[in-house]
């Protein structure tokens, strides 16, 4: 008898928490980007939502959720720059593949009319990918 099951995919997004008090408009921007990203995931998987992580404690909570669900894969959306402490507690000890998603939100920046929150929220393809990959390899 064939039993249909769905892969369990842990999904979360990260951003540097220090940006949020400085640029409060980033919060709804990141929430919108994360919601749109989750909608791209197929119905053929069970999504375990770790939320938007901006602190080590939130990362630990996401990791606890992923471990409890026994996820098969983790997908991490990099919303803007973040340090690896936002990532590692969520994925350490899972022994599953981790996919980093890092996409610039706008095709062509209007540099003359871009302010810091716009740069951080919509235009910055995360420069921390190298740091994340190096830390994943060491973890």
Language-model features, listed with the residues they occupy:
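Metallocofactor- and cofactor-centric catalytic cores in central/energy metabolism, strongly enriched
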Residues: 1-139
């Amino acid at each position: 008898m064939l039993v249909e099951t769905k892969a369990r995919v842990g999904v979360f997004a990260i951003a540097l928490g220090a940006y949020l008090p400085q640029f409060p408009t980033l919060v709804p921007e990141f929430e919108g980007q994360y919601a749109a990203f989750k909608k791209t995931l197929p119905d053929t998987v069970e999504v375990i939502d770790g939320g938007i992580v901006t602190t080590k404690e939130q990362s630990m909570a996401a990791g606890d959720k992923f471990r409890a669900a026994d996820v098969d894969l983790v997908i991490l959306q990099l919303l803007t720059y973040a340090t690896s402490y936002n990532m590692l507690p969520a994925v350490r000890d899972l022994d599953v593949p981790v996919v980093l998603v890092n996409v610039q939100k706008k095709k062509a920046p209007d540099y003359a009319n871009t302010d810091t929150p716009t740069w951080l929220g919509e235009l910055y393809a995360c420069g921390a990918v190298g740091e994340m990959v190096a830390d994943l390899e060491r973890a």
